[in-house]
Amino acid sequence: MRRLLMKGIRFYQRAFSAFSPAHCRYYPTCSNYTLEAINRFGAVKGVLMGVARILRCQPLVKGGFDPVPAHFSLRRNPQYKEEDHRGKKR
């Protein structure tokens, strides 16, 4: 199941995402975040984390650097909450 999900996300990245300008508010992108979460936590938890991340990616949120946390969580990685994608404090 894990491989099938990861292949589906990679297909999306090559077929659709590659032809549109990058507009994700977060780094890494939501699709890359989901790939890493699935790889690290398995299919079910990884998909849940990916869906939670996509739901956070909306106009009322600043975005920034938000890597997959070391432990399963549906919230933004608190270690990087006030930092931008270069790791500098805002």
From Swiss-Prot:
Keywords: Cell membrane, Membrane. It is a peripheral membrane protein. GO terms for cellular component: plasma membrane. Residues 68-90 are annotated as: Disordered. It is found in: Cell membrane. Residues 79-90 have a biased composition (Basic and acidic residues). InterPro entries: Membr_insert_effic_factor_YidD. PANTHER family: MEMBRANE PROTEIN INSERTION EFFICIENCY FACTOR-RELATED. HAMAP family: UPF0161_YidD (MF_00386). Could be involved in insertion of integral membrane proteins into the membrane. NCBIfam families: membrane protein insertion efficiency factor YidD. Belongs to the UPF0161 family. This is Putative membrane protein insertion efficiency factor. The lineage of its organism: Bacteria, Bacillati, Bacillota, Bacilli, Lactobacillales.
